């Protein structure tokens, strides 16, 4: 439906409603084919998506919004800030800032190394608190209801739908494509969730943003496994987020030492970005680190049975790995940073009924003993 007549008022109301719901940005793009549809297909053909076969199953839809929602006219793209206020990344030098097109005089002096104590393990920031899908989906339902009252038909997604959401977000001017493939925004850095409302209503599009990465390659240089193989190209099979979340089987032995103390996801390419120096603190406290998780040491996770795991990570993104996946990751982290004090817990894990946990625990024991002997 063409909503151009009188759509300015409706458009303004949508933006106001989105802000009332807590979204930091609400912008509009035409429901056109995504800019990188061909590159996405090539990436799949090279096998760089690893075991994320669901991406290939919906490839046609991802490359054509009309297959997702016939007669779609507009993609309303929303950004929800999840930054909790901790300093991000190692200090960014003035030279790095200039390379990124940022004036050092405008950079706040708030950078610090955010690596957690090695005995605790690291969880990606987006998974510190509650599952963002549940929180944001409720907000999208409110927007959907508003648009229905204006005769629109919608499909609403929080990174789970068949859309190349970063392309639509870039087209709407929410941000620009960083060399890590993450979307960057001058006021939020990279610490925001994307959500989309694909609608049959037509609204004037917003202009895209300029790319402000300049010559900066800090995200590429920061990747522990070399997963960013070139600017704007990521081989998921080497990405720590893929290895610790998406991969269901054993983590390749050659990549295990590079994972360090990370047990769920990885923020290294994000932490390295100079634009995250401008990140604004989110008003949404649901994404703050849970106290009971913050108190855990790596070896404590190995004592979790299925029920304790469910209780600890109820309504958390971490539950996605299930017990077997998280404890697999914990064993790898202990193999990298653990001490002889962790051996009793690992020896118990090596007898776990889940073969995936047992094998990784055995590997970790071997690694610690090698360091102890050395």
Pin down the residues of each PLM region.
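Auxiliary alpha/beta "docking" domains used to position bulky ligands
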Residues: 1-92, 110-212, 251, 260
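Iron-sulfur cluster-binding cysteine motifs and their immediate structural context
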Residues: 23, 218-242, 262-286, 345
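Non-heme iron-sulfur electron-transfer modules
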Residues: 42, 76, 189-198, 228-256, ...
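Alpha-solenoid HEAT/Armadillo-like helical repeat scaffolds in large eukaryotic proteins
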Residues: 300-305, 312-317, 345-353
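Amphipathic alpha-helical scaffolding segments comprising HEAT/armadillo-like alpha-solenoid repeats
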Residues: 310-312, 339-350, 370-374
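C-terminal accessory/binding modules appended to enzymatic or scaffolding proteins
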Residues: 312-338
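Short inter-helical turns and helix N-cap capping residues of alpha-solenoid HEAT/ARM repeat scaffolds
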Residues: 323, 353-354
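Structural detector for internal amphipathic alpha-helices that build alpha-solenoid repeat scaffolds
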Residues: 327-337, 359-370
């Amino acid at each position: 439906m063409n909503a151009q007549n009188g759509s300015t008022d409706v458009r303004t109301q949508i933006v106001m409603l989105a802000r009332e719901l807590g979204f930091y940005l609400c912008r509009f793009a035409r429901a056109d084919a995504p800019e990188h549809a061909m590159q996405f297909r090539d990436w799949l053909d090279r096998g760089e998506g690893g075991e994320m076969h669901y991406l290939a199953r919906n490839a046609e839809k991802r490359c054509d919004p009309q297959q997702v929602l016939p007669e779609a006219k507009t993609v309303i793209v929303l950004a929800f800030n999840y930054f909790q206020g901790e300093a991000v990344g190692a200090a960014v030098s003035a030279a790095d800032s200039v390379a990124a097109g940022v004036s050092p005089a405008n950079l706040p002096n708030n950078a610090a190394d955010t690596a957690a104590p090695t005995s605790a393990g690291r969880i990606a920031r987006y998974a510190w608190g509650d599952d963002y899908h549940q929180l944001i989906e409720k907000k999208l339902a409110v927007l959907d209801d508003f648009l229905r009252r204006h005769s629109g038909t919608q499909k609403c997604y929080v990174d789970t739908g068949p859309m190349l959401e970063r392309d639509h977000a870039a087209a709407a001017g929410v941000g620009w494509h960083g060399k890590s493939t993450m979307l960057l925004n001058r006021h939020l850095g990279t610490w925001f969730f994307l959500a989309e409302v694909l609608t049959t209503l037509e609204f004037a599009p917003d202009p895209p943003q300029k790319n402000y990465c300049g010559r900066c390659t800090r995200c590429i240089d920061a990747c522990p496994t070399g997963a960013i193989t070139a600017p704007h190209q990521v081989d998921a099979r080497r990405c720590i987020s893929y290895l610790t979340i998406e991969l269901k089987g054993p983590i390749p032995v050659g990549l295990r030492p590079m994972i360090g103390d990370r047990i769920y996801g990885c923020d290294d390419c994000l932490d390295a970005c100079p634009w995250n120096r401008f990140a604004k603190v989110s008003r949404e406290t649901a994404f703050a680190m849970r106290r009971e998780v913050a108190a855990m040491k790596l070896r404590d996770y190995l004592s979790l049975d299925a029920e304790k795991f469910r209780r600890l990570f109820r309504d958390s993104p971490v539950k996605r790995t299930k017990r077997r996946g998280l404890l697999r990751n914990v064993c790898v982290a202990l193999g990298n940073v653990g001490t002889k004090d962790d051996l009793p817990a690992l020896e118990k894990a090596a007898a776990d009924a889940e073969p995936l946990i047992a094998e990784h625990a055995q590997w970790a024991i071997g690694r610690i003993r090698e360091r102890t002997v050395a």
